């Protein structure tokens, strides 16, 4: 039995020596296939927060209220365009958080991914990965992702838009946790 183990070991060692480990290298992306404008819009229902705080550091951007927190996170060496314009507003029980940035001369030349998390402050074990409803693939980038943890909101919608302002090309991903809230499905009177 040990002879078979020795043969398997020799095959493994010789095949490892003959074919060194292959690590693919992703070449830089050309300027016409890269973007220089990023926008992440998060819509929440029902929501009527008035006070919020904004925090940003190391490709992690956060808007927080007394009920929930929204994080937009990029890979550690990912997004070259920092999301500098971060705002929140609420109207008709729908809250919107906008993370945005645009640059004239900085283009995203390497593969990147954006992740969005919406988390209720009240502890909960409910975790929902938002479903991709629509997505275009113009630029070379990894697919976006988003999740919602908690039960303080009925509906969560996330739209991520990427644009090359020189060519006008636009790429976007639309994610949500479901259809319309029951309030709209059943009508105002129920």
Swiss-Prot record:
Coiled-coil regions listed in the entry: none
Protein family membership: Belongs to the orthopoxvirus OPG209 protein family.
Protein's name according to its UniProt entry: Protein OPG209
Gene name per UniProt: OPG209
């Amino acid at each position: 039995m040990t002879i078979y183990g020795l043969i398997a070991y020799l095959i493994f060692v010789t095949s490892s020596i003959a074919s060194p480990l292959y690590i693919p290298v992703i070449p830089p992306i050309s300027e016409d296939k890269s973007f220089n404008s990023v926008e992440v819009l998060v819509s929440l229902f029902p929501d009527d927060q008035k006070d919020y705080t904004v925090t940003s550091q190391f490709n992690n951007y956060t808007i927080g209220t007394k009920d929930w927190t929204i994080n937009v996170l990029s890979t550690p060496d990912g997004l070259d365009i920092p999301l500098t314009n971060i705002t929140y507003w609420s109207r008709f029980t729908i809250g919107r958080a906008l993370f945005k940035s645009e640059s004239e001369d900085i283009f995203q030349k390497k593969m990147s991914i954006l992740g969005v998390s919406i988390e209720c402050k009240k502890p909960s074990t409910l975790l929902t990965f938002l479903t991709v409803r629509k997505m275009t693939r113009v630029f070379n980038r990894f697919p976006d992702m988003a999740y919602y943890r908690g039960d303080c909101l009925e509906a969560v919608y996330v739209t991520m838009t990427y644009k090359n302002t020189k060519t006008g090309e636009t790429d976007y991903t639309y994610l949500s946790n479901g259809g319309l809230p029951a309030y709209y499905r059943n009508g105002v009177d129920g």
